[in-house]
């Protein structure tokens, strides 16, 4: 892509990098005026990422691998940094990995935010991050063959069926609070559970001294599916299904990545329609989480009332696109359907109704003593931990960091829509609740402005051609935080590589630090304050480090204890 050098962002940072590490950069390629990919010497990879992260206000939203043996004879690892200092831009640090040794130096000891990404690269490509502190599998199940790595370009034998797992547990849960704790294996998952996760809380009496958890029980292989079986616009509809609530955010991030790779100019009206639907999703998600927060503190009247008002956000979606879920609207280059005058007027009426309803509910919520008593000082995300791990969304804004892609890297129509960035410094559950409360009102204001100021332009840019192996990032500030996608186009009308990173993926690593020092009854509230993008937790193993005893407890029992705070499951 040809980029006008006079408008390029990040040049001062790149100049400082070259001064700090002479000869480290091997190649530099611009994708957009605010996106650049630099290839560095592999031995300097940790130093370069560490320098950009800590010396230039970088954050690490996503890292990923790529099998580029057919392109350059190597594997590659990419570390995408969002630079959020004085000069806001994206710098993607790339290193080529030898195809025979498959080794590269781990960045995690220098930048802890890299830990999950490097574990996933190890699983999916068989690359070896030398020095990675946590060598456990992240994505692949225990019975997956050691020599089969799903995202390599090698042919896979899909007829393979792994051997049944044994009764012996092979995944080592880590307890940093007390290494002498005795752990008992947990039974199988409930077959009726959606998106289960397994938590282990290490406790001393009622106090949590540490926590560990395992997820990815229902990994769907969407990236592999997109690369092998779907055309470019078909992936748009697949990305809609990444999340049950913020699917539209993912489809915007995906289409944005392809549009950035090809330099496609999206019509302004399409940008505005995308922004409107993104804020409808934010209303839906935030009202749902506020309702669940009421439930977790035992305020079920508030739970039911928030869910009642939330229905209006789904009615908005149905008015605007014909479905209560915001599916099927995006295409590469724009959108498929317009918002007509009658739809716009009815939506504006709903916005006014919701503003009055939410105002009344928030006043009731904040007047409920149980809310402040149960949420203030609970589940604190320390600022230093937040800085090291790059969490996102209301979680990071509740710890005082002003991070929001709508402000840092405006996309769609967010450069034109008036908006306010809300932060709270408490770092606790209450701060995260208040971020969502403020953002709910701001979303209503943004919807009102966007619906009243829709430009008169076409909806879709057509007639462009796909360029093999062009690549770029796409991103969206979804309700839970930033969704970041990276797409590399192929030469067969399919993607060569698609990396889709949902917001919750960035938030899970800090959860154990938020649970430490709190009580077992607070665990559901703390976990819920992440607004985690999964439906339920299978069960929890409680390990009493003082008595050297452990007990497996159904999650519903922990949830019940968190609400009424009597009849402890530990007794």
Model-derived regions, located:
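Metal/cofactor-centered catalytic core regions of large enzymes
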Residues: 42-45, 112, 138-571
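Terminal low-complexity/charged segments
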Residues: 1-210, 371-373, 387, 443, ...
């Amino acid at each position: 892509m040809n980029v006008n050098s006079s408008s390029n962002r990040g040049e001062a940072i790149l100049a400082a990098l070259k001064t700090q590490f002479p000869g480290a950069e091997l190649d530099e390629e611009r994708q957009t005026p605010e996106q650049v990919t630099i290839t560095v010497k592999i031995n300097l990879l940790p130093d370069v990422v560490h320098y950009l992260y800590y010396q230039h206000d970088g954050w690490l939203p996503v890292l990923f691998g790529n099998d580029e043996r057919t392109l350059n004879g190597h594997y590659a690892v990419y570390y995408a940094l969002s630079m959020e200092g004085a000069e806001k831009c994206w710098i993607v640090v790339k290193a080529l990995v030898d195809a025979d040794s498959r080794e590269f130096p781990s960045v995690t000891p220098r930048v802890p935010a890299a830990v999950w990404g490097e574990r996933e690269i190890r699983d999916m490509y068989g690359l070896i991050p030398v020095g990675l502190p946590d060598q456990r599998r992240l994505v692949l199940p225990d019975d997956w063959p050691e020599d089969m790595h799903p995202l390599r370009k090698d042919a896979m034998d899909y007829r393979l069926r792994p051997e049944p797992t044994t009764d012996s547990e092979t995944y080592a849960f880590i307890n940093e609070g007390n290494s002498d704790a005795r752990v008992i294996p947990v039974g199988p998952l409930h077959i009726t559970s959606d998106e289960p996760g397994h938590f282990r809380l290490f406790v001393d009496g009622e106090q949590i001294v540490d926590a560990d958890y395992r997820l990815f029980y229902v990994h769907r292989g969407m990236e592999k599916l997109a690369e092998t079986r779907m055309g470019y616009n078909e992936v748009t509809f697949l990305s809609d299904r990444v999340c049950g609530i913020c699917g539209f955010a993912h489809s915007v991030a995906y289409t944005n990545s392809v549009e950035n790779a090809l330099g496609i100019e999206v019509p302004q009206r399409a940008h505005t329609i995308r922004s409107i639907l993104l804020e409808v999703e934010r209303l839906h998600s935030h009202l749902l989480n506020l309702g669940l927060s009421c439930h977790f503190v035992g305020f079920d009247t508030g739970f039911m009332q928030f869910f009642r008002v939330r229905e209006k956000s789904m009615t908005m979606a149905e008015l605007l696109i014909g479905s209560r879920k915001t599916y099927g609207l995006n295409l590469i280059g724009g959108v498929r359907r317009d918002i007509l005058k009658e739809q716009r007027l009815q939506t504006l009426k709903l916005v006014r109704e919701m503003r009055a309803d939410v105002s009344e509910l928030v006043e009731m919520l904040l007047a409920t003593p149980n809310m402040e008593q149960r949420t203030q000082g609970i589940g604190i995300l320390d600022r230093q931990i937040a800085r090291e791990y790059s969490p996102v969304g209301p979680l990071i804004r509740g710890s005082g960091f002003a991070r929001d892609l709508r402000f840092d890297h405006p996309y769609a129509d967010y450069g034109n829509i008036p908006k306010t960035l809300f932060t709270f410094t408490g770092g606790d559950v209450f701060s995260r609740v208040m971020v969502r409360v403020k953002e709910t009102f701001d979303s209503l204001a943004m919807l009102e402005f966007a619906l009243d100021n829709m430009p008169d332009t076409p909806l879709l840019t057509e007639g462009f051609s796909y360029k093999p192996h062009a690549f770029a990032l796409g991103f969206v500030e979804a309700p839970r935080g930033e969704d970041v996608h990276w797409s590399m186009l192929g030469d067969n009308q399919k993607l060569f590589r698609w990396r889709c990173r949902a917001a919750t993926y960035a938030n899970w690593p800090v959860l154990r630090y938020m649970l430490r020092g709190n009580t077992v009854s607070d665990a559901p509230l703390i976990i819920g304050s992440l607004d985690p993008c999964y439906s339920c937790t299978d069960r929890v193993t409680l390990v009493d480090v003082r008595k050297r005893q452990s007990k497996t407890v159904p999650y519903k029992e922990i949830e019940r204890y968190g609400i009424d705070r009597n009849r402890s499951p530990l007794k």
